[in-house]
């Protein structure tokens, strides 16, 4: 009984957000976006990358001369902005001035079926579907971590469409199945049943994912859902957080939502 009372108190005392929402559309026409920890947005529109502030004011642009269509951007490291062109499995890194630093052709590293990548503070992760594994490389292309073949760990079919990482966790969205959690070294931790999740984000020890028009919060240390936030926004494709605001990509628009903790 004491355990359940304690658990109930934990759930009740978890931080929640007020349902009153102040929304602001700051960008129209984005294919993908990311944010760094300084509040800069990095927005992809086909083969062009825009760096903008939180009001949507353009600060810098980068245009790809090779005509690779970027499909993903990750700014977890503000000094190494990661871009991914999935058609040719090419990863590019820009500095904070959007100057090109390096280009990595993953096919030249014998990866021919890369479905998802993400940045990390000491390298980058990629998911190769043909091998059904996650691999982590440093910036000199030395392999520093890998998972077991995921088919040995899971019963569900694998269709990983996106991933994200911080200095504690790696999260993968397994489409129409759930979310896979690994530690920073690639050891499998657990899965969450989230068949309708559309995107994921890591915030310290918190996993945040979108499901329909809600944001769901999971404490990864407690393995506990702490709260849900209902929004007026559907088709959420990406979630970012900066300075008491969520930034959501939905229907090619970036929408800023201010929240106040209760």
PLM feature spans:
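A short beta-strand motif characteristic of beta-propeller blades
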Residues: 19-26, 57-63, 100-107, 143-155, ...
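Conserved beta-strand positions in repeat-built beta-propeller and related beta-rich domains
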Residues: 43-45, 82-87, 94, 126-131, ...
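Bacterial Sec-dependent N-terminal signal peptides
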Residues: 1-23, 261
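Repeated scaffold domains used in trafficking and secretory/extracellular systems
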Residues: 28-36, 67-75, 111-120, 155-163, ...
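Short loop/turn segments that connect beta-strands within beta-propeller blades
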Residues: 53-57, 95-99, 138-141, 183-187, ...
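Blade-level signature of beta-propeller repeat domains, shared across WD40, Kelch, NHL, RCC1
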Residues: 237-262
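Beta-strand-rich domains and repeat architectures in extracellular enzymes and scaffolds
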Residues: 24-47
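WD40 beta-propeller blade core
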Residues: 50-51, 90-92, 135, 179-181, ...
């Amino acid at each position: 009984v004491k355990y359940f009372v304690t658990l109930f108190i934990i759930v009740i005392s978890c931080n929640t957000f007020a349902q009153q929402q102040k929304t602001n559309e700051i960008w129209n026409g984005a294919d993908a976006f990311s944010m760094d920890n300084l509040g800069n947005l990095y927005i992809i529109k086909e083969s062009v990358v825009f760096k903008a502030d939180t009001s949507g004011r353009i600060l810098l642009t980068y245009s790809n001369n090779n005509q690779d269509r970027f499909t993903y951007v990750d700014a977890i490291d503000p000094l190494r902005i990661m871009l991914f062109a999935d058609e040719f499995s090419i990863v590019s890194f820009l500095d904070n001035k959007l100057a090109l630093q390096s280009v990595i052709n993953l096919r030249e590293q014998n990866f021919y079926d890369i479905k998802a990548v993400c940045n990390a503070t000491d390298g980058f992760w990629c998911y190769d579907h043909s091998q059904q594994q996650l691999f982590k490389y440093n910036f000199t292309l030395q392999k520093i971590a890998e998972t077991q073949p995921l088919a040995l760990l899971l019963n569900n079919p694998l269709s990983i469409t996106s991933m994200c990482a911080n200095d504690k966790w790696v999260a993968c969205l397994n489409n129409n199945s759930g979310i896979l959690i690994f530690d920073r070294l690639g050891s499998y931790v657990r899965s969450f049943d989230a068949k309708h999740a559309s995107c994921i984000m890591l915030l310290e020890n918190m996993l945040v994912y979108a499901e329909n028009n809600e944001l769901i919060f999971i404490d990864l240390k407690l393995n506990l859902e702490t709260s849900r936030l209902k929004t007026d926004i559907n088709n959420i494709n990406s979630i970012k957080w900066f300075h008491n605001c969520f930034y959501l990509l939905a229907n090619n628009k970036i929408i800023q939502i201010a929240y106040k903790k209760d």
